[in-house]
Amino acid sequence: MNIEILGKSFPMSMGLDAVKEITAKMGCTMEQMGDVMTAGTPEEQLANITVMAAAMARSAYRREKVRCVLWGEDCKLVEPPDADQMLCAFDLLDSKKLIEAVTETMQEANKTTVDVEPSKNAKSHA
């Protein structure tokens, strides 16, 4: 998932570093992160979601830096804005995009896939 900030697109990732940062800043567990998005006043909710978005954008940035080092690539990366900068960059009309980006990034992290190989799966004899 990407988030657009003032015309620039930044990838978002729910890496373990993002989980660690979000739970530490929000004082919640991994299971409670969804609840944090809906807790408090609308202003507090937007601030919390912005903190989460910034952590997810930083996670994707750090992941790409590691990938570049591992593959010996010279990557020209732009560091994403922090939460305070995001609050300045977004207005109320953008808040829906922000909420969707955070929600979709969390949902993508929870997706699991199952490979089905008919030759290796048990047959039902019901």
Question: Would you name each region that the model predicts?
Answer:
Residues 10-12:
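Short, isolated positions in well-ordered beta-strands
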Residues 22-27:
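Short amphipathic alpha-helical "interface-anchor" segments enriched in bulky aromatics
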